[in-house]
Amino acid sequence: MTRRGVLSRIASGIILAWGWKRAVIALLAGALSSLAMEPFNAWPVLFITFPIAVWLIDGSAAGKRRGVPAAAMAGWWFGFGYFVPGLYWIGYAFLVDADTFAWLLPAAICGLPAYLALFTALGFALARLLWRPDSLRILSLAVSLTISEWLRGHLLTGFPWNAFGYALTEPLVLAQSISVIGIWGLTLLTVAIFASPAVLIDGGTNTRRRWAVPAMALGVLAAMTVFGGIRLKLSPTQLVDNVRLRIMQPNLPQDARFNYSAKADVMQKYLSLSDRSTGPKSTGVRDVSLLIWPESAFPFFLSREADAMAQIAELLPKGTVLLTGAVRPPELPPGRRITRAYNSIYAIDHDGSILSVYDKLHLVPFGEFLPYQNLMEKIGFVQLTKVQGGFLSGVARHNLELPNAPPLLPLICYEAIFPDEIAIGNNRPGWMLNLTNDGWFGISSGPYQHLQQARMRAIEQGLPLVRAANTGVSAVIDPVGRIVAELGLGVEGVLDSGLPAPVAPTIYARVGELPAAVLVALVMMLVLLRKRPPGS
């Protein structure tokens, strides 16, 4: 039997599968697809799994099985299989305080993937509406999943984690396309490229025509590689003059970060680590311009603790600024009890004065707030951080101006995964700062996925990104995504580095999602116009 004959038999088995067999095929294909993401980056598996997705939708149009619901159900199983192994690490957060939250572990591991899989189901259903029995069905799937992934990233606060386009962000040469078309444009190309082998089983065409579509897909992949290689070559890492960074990664256990009685130990660890000598020529914190501590670093309100502020002032030499995460109380009348707070970044001068503050805008549902907060608290629910009333959201994203370094754009925790929220406009900063605490997720794939998505924001904007994480991975990333320096997951220490200089604003930085929107519109028009009957 020829290779095409074997492939055709496999495809026929998938197309004709029904009931539980069809669900299992979709589930396994989705699970295998998760290996395309960090830390595995085994994206060639998508050359297997996305053709299976095409054949599953082919099967929903076979005989009496015709219909959108059949495609949607296949999409749901594919998405569920994709998100469970891709997001399993979220369950670790529910074990930090196991006595309170362990009972919610099944909901975290299965409930969130079940919800996110609804968007994959929507993508398959939309693809089925646009379906036709020729090579254009590849584009139908690509544009439909791009739309559904965009919706996943925006509806109900949005969660674009592990969008399919992230499969083509490693190696770094492939990721450079994101500087033009963003993650949503890259998602469209990713699905189209990897789904293309599905047409090899199509009948009624000669061998040359059958191979034309995969050949074009490989051509796009080659063009992305060439473009990325040229961009990397033309953008060597350059450093800003007279700016030295020190990132402190304390690797504190989660319970210490929320235990007020541990405040003295926490401060002592921060102070000693920050002034650690890293070599025979190092003089500790006196060598640095910017000392950087991670997200919500203290088990207390920093600005209300005079002793802690005095210790920071004593630590910092003249000309050094501390950038640190901290929980910030709102301004209240005297005597009013504090019940809510902001998740913030402080810039603190050598005399202990607060130079500027940024309050986190995009809060984490169920981590920093609960939907219908008051009602949920009345029936006994609390979010993971146990802040009564939930955290407050900031008013607007703004640059932090510094006396000894270029202005920075602050991003706290998973704010770095939302590309279109980094609206820089005319007030372009010199770099981006991402403070996070991935210690919630243990030694798992979660922190690596978070790092990779933050790297893409650097490439999109042409700006360096500096990342300080409680347990890692802390890193200094140049404007084309190179990791200049890093401190690994689960490591205690400090990371010294220069500050990479930005490159010219990218196309994405100038026009945002416009190229991706144009690409989606053109593909949609091509699919719709070709569906019209002759003479219409």
Swiss-Prot record:
Q: What is its EC number?
A: 2.3.1.269
One of the GO BP terms on file: lipoprotein biosynthetic process
Which key words are in the record? Acyltransferase, Cell inner membrane, Cell membrane, Membrane, Transferase, Transmembrane, Transmembrane helix
One GO cellular component term, please give it: plasma membrane
In this chain the CN hydrolase domain maps to: 248-501
Where does the record place it?
Cell inner membrane
Cystine bridges: which residues? none
Q: Which GO terms describe its molecular function?
A: N-acyltransferase activity
- Pathway listed: Protein modification; lipoprotein biosynthesis (N-acyl transfer)
Q: Catalytic residues? A: 295 (proton acceptor), 360, 413 (nucleophile)
Q: How does it sit in the membrane?
A: Multi-pass membrane protein
Bilayer-crossing regions: 10-30, 42-62, 76-96, 107-127, 136-158, 181-201, 212-232, 509-529
Database matches in InterPro entries: Apolipo_AcylTrfase (IPR004563), C-N_Hydrolase (IPR003010), C-N_Hydrolase_sf (IPR036526), LNT_N (IPR045378)
Name of the top EC class for this enzyme? transferase
Q: What does this protein do?
A: Catalyzes the phospholipid dependent N-acylation of the N-terminal cysteine of apolipoprotein, the last step in lipoprotein maturation.
Q: What family does the database annotate?
A: Belongs to the CN hydrolase family. Apolipoprotein N-acyltransferase subfamily.
Q: What is this protein called?
A: Apolipoprotein N-acyltransferase
Upper lineage is: Bacteria, Pseudomonadati, Pseudomonadota, Alphaproteobacteria, Hyphomicrobiales
